[in-house]
C-alpha cells in the first residue's frame, strides 16, 4: 500500500476544509427566521381550528 499518497490526499483535504473562508451567518439566520414564522403560523392556525374541530366531534 502506498501510505504516502494517502497521507498527501488526507493532508490536502484537511487544508481545503480548514482554508475555506467562513460563510456569513445571515443566510442561515434568514432560514431560521422563516422556519420560526412557519411554526408560529401553524400554531396559530391549529389554535383557531381546534375549537371548531372539537365542536364538530361533540355534535357527531
Swiss-Prot record:
Entry GO CC: extracellular space
Location within or outside the cell: Secreted
The organism's place on the tree of life at top rank: Eukaryota
Record keywords: Amidation, Antibiotic, Antimicrobial, Immunity, Innate immunity, Secreted, Signal
Modified residues (Leucine amide): 59
Coiled-coil parts of chain: none
Predominant subcellular localization, coarse grouping: secreted
BP-aspect Gene Ontology terms: antibacterial humoral response; defense response to Gram-negative bacterium; defense response to Gram-positive bacterium; innate immune response
Annotated signal sequence range: 1-25
One of the Pfam families matching this protein, by short name: Cecropin
PROSITE patterns for this protein: CECROPIN (PS00268)
Family statement drawn from the similarity comment of this UniProt entry: Belongs to the cecropin family.
Function as written in the Swiss-Prot or TrEMBL entry: Cecropins have lytic and antibacterial activity against several Gram-positive and Gram-negative bacteria.
UniProt protein name: Cecropin-B
Species of provenance: Anopheles gambiae (African malaria mosquito)
Taxonomic placement: Eukaryota, Metazoa, Ecdysozoa, Arthropoda, Hexapoda
